[in-house]
Amino acid sequence: MIRIGIHGASGKMGYEIISNLKNNEQAILSVAYTIEPMPFDVGDAIVTNDLKTLFDNSDVIIDFSIKDGAVNLINYARTNPKPLIIGTTGLGSEGDELIKLASSVMPILQATNMSLGVAVLNRLTEFASRVLDGFDIEIVEMHHRRKVDAPSGTALTLATHAAKARNLTLDSVRVSGRDGMIGARSKDEIAVMSLRGGDIVGRHTVGFYNDGEFIELNHTATSRATFAKGAIKAAIWIKSKEPKLYSIYDCLGL
């Protein structure tokens, strides 16, 4: 059995992963790392706030924490290599560069979204952006009121795929909001808008708009379990991989 440690175990994703590990035939929960009191039962797993304990008792570590916590984890792993699944979003360019650097000594899979459906949506977005070259692209993401980062990492990934398909860099065309007399929409811009409210797990819409017609691609998550199952699948997959930075597409064969 593969021993999986959860970094950020007391959060919502930690709960979902731990719940989905209970009946898994290939992996078990070995360590629940948290700086907060554990709000639910983790069985025989070790509960700790010590990174050494987490690393010593895990074959693979799944991270769903916050930016500072994820950065600390990765820095520790650079001198104590261990396969990592990084699901924390909002790390910024410095965090992404740190992950690339760390992947030279351990296998790391970084994904802004662990679901199969979103992985397919990314591929569809790239295809549609290339084929529908003259269409305007607008992306809208919706999440629960407690989500702290905006736009979502998934929305930015979708926008990156759209820009890449048109040989553009996202930074050069991204629009985050519109207000006032801003003038007409430019040809290449890609808008990424965020809505927050209620308990929405996650909804992403990529719209392609032209005169006389439009297409909208949509993914709605109704349960965090879909992300948890994807993270566990990735953890099992990455255990035997060589040091490298992997994507969810590598794991899913897309």
Swiss-Prot record:
Binding site for NAD(+): 8-13, 87-89, 111-114
Entry GO CC: cytosol
Molecular-function GO terms, alphabetical: 4-hydroxy-tetrahydrodipicolinate reductase; NAD binding; NADP binding; oxidoreductase activity, acting on CH or CH2 groups, NAD or NADP as acceptor
Catalytic activity line of the entry: (S)-2,3,4,5-tetrahydrodipicolinate + NAD(+) + H2O = (2S,4S)-4-hydroxy-2,3,4,5-tetrahydrodipicolinate + NADH + H(+); (S)-2,3,4,5-tetrahydrodipicolinate + NADP(+) + H2O = (2S,4S)-4-hydroxy-2,3,4,5-tetrahydrodipicolinate + NADPH + H(+)
Active site: 143, 147
Alphabetically ordered keywords of this record: Amino-acid biosynthesis, Cytoplasm, Diaminopimelate biosynthesis, Lysine biosynthesis, NAD, NADP, Oxidoreductase
Involved pathway(s): Amino-acid biosynthesis; L-lysine biosynthesis via DAP pathway; (S)-tetrahydrodipicolinate from L-aspartate: step 4/4
Enzyme class (EC, first level): oxidoreductase
UniProt EC number: 1.17.1.8
Positions contributing to (S)-2,3,4,5-tetrahydrodipicolinate binding: 144, 153-154
Record keyword Amino-acid biosynthesis present: yes
Subcellular location per the Swiss-Prot or TrEMBL entry: Cytoplasm
NCBIfam families: dapB
Family recorded in the similarity comment: Belongs to the DapB family.
Name of protein: 4-hydroxy-tetrahydrodipicolinate reductase
Lineage of the organism: Bacteria, Pseudomonadati, Campylobacterota, Epsilonproteobacteria, Campylobacterales
